[in-house]
Structure formats: C-alpha cells, structure tokens
C-alpha cells in the first residue's frame, strides 16, 4: 500500500511532484513493488500533461506514453507527475506557472533541469524511479545536482511516443534512480538495451574543452582519473564545447518557436519567449555553420567512442546553486555531446563541492553496449562511494 498522505507531506517543501495519482497500484514483473514518478511532458493516461506550460494547463493525457506502458507492464506503480522547467527549455526548474522545485540537499537551491522534479523526487525518496527527458543534459544534470544516478539512452533506443517534444532529433526519455541496479532495471524495461560484446579500448577524456569549471569539479574529476587504474587517453574536438552546445540550443529554439507559434502570448513566460527568439532570428549563414558544427561533432564523438571504451567527463561544470542566482550558460557543455552524437550516457555521484552539494561524473558509451556502460559505471561507483542520502528523505 502506497502512503500518499506521507508523500504529500514530504513533497510539500520540495514541490517535486505537481500531481499524485492516489489510486496508483503496481503489479507483477521485473519492477514489482517499485514506484515511478513521471515528468510532466510525458503522457500518463488520465493525468495532467502540462509540459510545465500554462498553455497546456488543464490538458489530460488520453493514454500512456509508450515507455509508461512498458513500466506498467513490468509491475511499476505510476504515482504522479513531476515538476519541470517550462517547456523543458532550461536547467534550473524555477517554473513560473507551477513553482520552484527545491534540491533535497539544500532548500533554496536548484535541483537542476529541465527534469528538476525527477531529480528532487528520487533523491528525497518520494519515488524509486523517475522518468525525465534529456535534450542536451536534462536527465543527467538533475542527477548530478541531486546526487543520484541518471541514464540518457541513445535517442534511437527509446520511444518518443507520448512525449511533448522539445527537439525531435535531440530528445529522449531516460530514468533516474538512487542506485545503478534500479537504474538498469528501468533502462532494460523501457529502452533497447544492448548486451553486446565487451567494448575494448582505453578510457578517454577531452582535452582543451574551453569549459570554465568550478575548482571542486576539477579536483574531483582528477580523483576520478587517478582511480581509473589505467591510462586515460586524450581526445580533442574541433570546436569549443560552448560553441557546440550553442549550436544545439539554436536547433532547439528553432523547433520550439515553430511549435509554440500559435500559443497565446500571455500563456508563455517572458523568459521562454526570449529563448524562443534565438533560433528564428539566426542568420542563414550562422545557421548553416551551426548545422555543420553539429554534424562534425556528432561524427567526431562517435569516432572517439568507436576507438575507445568510453568517454569520461564531469556531468556539469558546477554543483547546484541558489535559486536566487542566474543559471550558468555552460551547464550543458559536457552533456550535450551524447545527444548530438546519439549515444548512451550515465551520470553518477562523484563527490561534493565546498557547499556540500553533489557533483556528477558522466560516462558516454557505445550504442548497443549499454551493459558495458553500466558495468563501467559500477566500477567507478564502487571506487568513489559518493552517493549520500539527503537529510530531507522519506524512508519507507
């Protein structure tokens, strides 16, 4: 029996869930006994399907998204809808229509985004598994900021049916959980999970990325390099990560501007309206350059992963920050690569910063070799032992 009264009380200071389904029940199967929260841009039959947008307030999903159908069939109880950044464009989750979501590790701090409710709910023990969506890092950044585990599948490995898309080419649905075992259980149910032959080659990281990282992130990542136990190769991309990420943002802004072209002006926040201007106002020459950069980067990252076992990077250049601060432009500099190259990636806890906020390690692997990716994550997880339960936690 799910104690929804306890869930409502524990959720109140966090605003991770926007709606609960008090009638939710699980069944038999691989996920029997587990509860799942679903980001508000993923359809759950009979539940609000807002995508964090005022323009969709009152919309109710007519049927489950394909991934939700798979989770139900595996026995999971789908218990409610999770807060998110408006239209999934941003990485802070201070939604102007549905409120700010708090990081369970520190009230007043962002859980990341755009799947901020997903990261917060899992970290606080409100659900066992949460579904998020990831356009350029929106599963992995909340996983890092909230100190949990997040999996971004290759876009071609998971259905988009029932997802309110941000950008069709970049978007995918992925799970978050408090352990790699739970994360893999969800991933095996909802994605085309590959048990291909063990990937060979050394680990690799990127040199001269141009990303301005917080000192604690640099120090913790150096610890990861030392713990790897083998030599880490270096690779370099032709463009700074900030330029690559911006090209992805322009692509997303163009798609979303077209999507919301007929939305009432008073139904979109001033911030979202501003973000939706960048793509349409881009000159033809600059847009051609953006597309070339995305294509070149996709091929380069795929080539690096084909040669090496996996790429390791920080998940984000910083830990969670106060809601009173502006979001750094570089939040998705590291995470955008897996979307641009259509590759699977995991974020796992790497340690904490000086403020005690979690930091994340990202591992990007090969499509069809997801089992290898999880095994590598387990090896690092055992060495780092960095998962920490927040004080704000609902124990079952």
Task: List where the protein language model places each region.
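A short helix-breaking turn/cap at a secondary-structure junction
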Residues: 16-20, 24, 149-222, 386-396
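Short glycine/serine-rich loop segments
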Residues: 69-187, 339, 344-350, 357-360
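Short, well-ordered beta-strand elements within core beta-sheets of diverse protein domains
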Residues: 55-59, 171-178, 278-282, 363-364
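Short helix-loop capping/hinge segments that flank enzyme active sites or metal/cofactor-binding pockets
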Residues: 31-51, 250-298, 302, 349-360
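Short, well-ordered alpha-helical
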Residues: 1-60, 65, 87-90, 320, ...
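Charged, often glycine-rich, active-site loop that binds/positions anionic groups
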Residues: 94, 98-99, 244-259
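Glycine-rich, small-residue loops and helix-cap segments
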Residues: 39, 73, 184, 190, ...
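Gly/Ser-rich, acidic/histidine-flanked active-site/gating loops
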Residues: 36, 45-48, 188-250, 278-281, ...
């Amino acid at each position: 029996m799910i104690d929804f009264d306890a869930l409502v009380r524990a959720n109140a200071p966090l605003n991770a869930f926007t709606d609960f389904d008090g009638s939710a029940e699980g069944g038999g199967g691989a996920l029997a006994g587990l509860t799942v929260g679903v980001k508000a841009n993923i359809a759950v039959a009979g539940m609000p399907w807002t995508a964090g947008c005022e323009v969709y307030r009152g919309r109710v999903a007519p049927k489950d998204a394909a991934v939700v159908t798979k989770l139900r069939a595996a026995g999971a109880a789908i218990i409610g809808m999770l807060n998110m950044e408006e239209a999934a464009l941003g990485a802070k989750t201070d939604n102007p229509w549905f409120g700010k979501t708090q990081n369970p590790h520190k009230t007043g701090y962002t859980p990341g985004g755009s799947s901020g409710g997903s990261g917060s709910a899992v970290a606080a023990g409100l659900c066992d598994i949460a579904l998020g969506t990831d356009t350029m890092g929106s599963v992995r950044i909340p996983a890092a900021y909230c100190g949990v585990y997040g999996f971004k599948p290759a876009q071609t490995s998971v259905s988009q049916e029932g997802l309110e898309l941000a950008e069709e080419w970049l978007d995918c649905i992925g799970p978050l959980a408090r352990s790699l075992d739970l994360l893999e259980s969800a991933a095996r149910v909802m994605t085309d999970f590959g048990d291909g032959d063990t990937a060979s080659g050394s680990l690799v990281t990127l040199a001269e990325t141009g990303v301005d990282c917080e000192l604690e992130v640099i120090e913790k990542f150096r610890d990861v390099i030392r713990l790897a136990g083998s030599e880490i190769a270096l690779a370099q991309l032709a463009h700074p990560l900030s330029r690559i990420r911006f090209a992805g943002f322009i692509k997303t802004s163009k798609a979303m501007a077209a999507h919301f072209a007929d939305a009432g002006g008073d139904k979109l926040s001033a911030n979202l309206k501003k973000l939706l201007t960048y793509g349409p106002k881009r000159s033809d020459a600059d847009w051609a350059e953006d597309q070339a950069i995305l294509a070149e980067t996709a091929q380069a990252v795929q080539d690096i992963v084909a040669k090496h076992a996996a790429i390791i990077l920080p998940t984000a250049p910083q830990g969670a920050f106060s809601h009173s601060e502006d979001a750094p432009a570089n939040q998705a500099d590291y995470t955008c690569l897996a979307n641009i190259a259509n590759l699977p990636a995991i974020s796992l806890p790497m340690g904490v910063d000086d403020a005690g906020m979690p930091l994340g390690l990202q591992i990007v692997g090969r499509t069809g070799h997801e089992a290898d990716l999880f095994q590598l994550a387990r090896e690092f997880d055992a060495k780092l032992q960095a998962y920490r339960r927040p004080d704000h936690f609902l124990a079952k």
